[in-house]
Amino acid sequence: LQRGRALKSCSIRVSSHRRYGFFIYSPMIFYFSGTGNSEWIANQLSKGQNEDLVFIPEALKNEALEFDLQKDEKIGFVFPIYSWAPPEIVLRFINRISLKEYQNQYLFFVCSCGDDTGLTQQVLVKALNDKGWLCHAGFSVTMPNNYVLLPGFDVDTKELERIKLANAVPRLTEINALISRREKIFSCHEGSLPFLKTRIINPLFNRFQMS
């Protein structure tokens, strides 16, 4: 599995004060990317929504875990699918961050997947609900399979990669428009046998990766 190559530094807006030993940042789109697909998605959303980006590993490393919300802000999470679920680092980040002045602001997620998402929507919505936050929208974007996840899987052919990238552009245009209108909609491709993939295979995958 190829993960975690160095990405470009993200733009972070910082307020002029501290609380409880942590910087408090203005809200933006939080993202994690392992091979670059989700970074590209995050950049397209950042341009479309005029929101800054926060690279999740960098925020965790710097203990930048408190974020100031404005009344009409939009809050986004962008990440790849790892074995039909959000990456553990994304769930850990959600568990640790604090959103100051949260008042049911519009919250969405966009995930990149090679083929399908399994029950990713359920997993992420529950993680947000556990923090007292309501998820209003969620989307999946099919991107090239450019890493080997499990035995029996392979990267996409160059032709399939080209087709996926071509289709991703109008898909992001559509998603940006829906988010701009603050639509309450979920459009994730679960695929076949989502329970098996997310609830059984994913825990085994995570255990294998940590062993």
Where are the model-predicted features located?
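Low-complexity, intrinsically disordered or signal/transmembrane-proximal segments
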Residues: 2, 17-20, 25
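FMN-binding flavodoxin-like domain, especially the glycine-rich phosphate-binding loop
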Residues: 25-29, 35-40, 44-60, 69-208
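Short acidic active-site motifs
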Residues: 63-65
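Cysteine-centered iron-sulfur cluster-binding motifs in ferredoxin-type domains/subunits
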Residues: 211
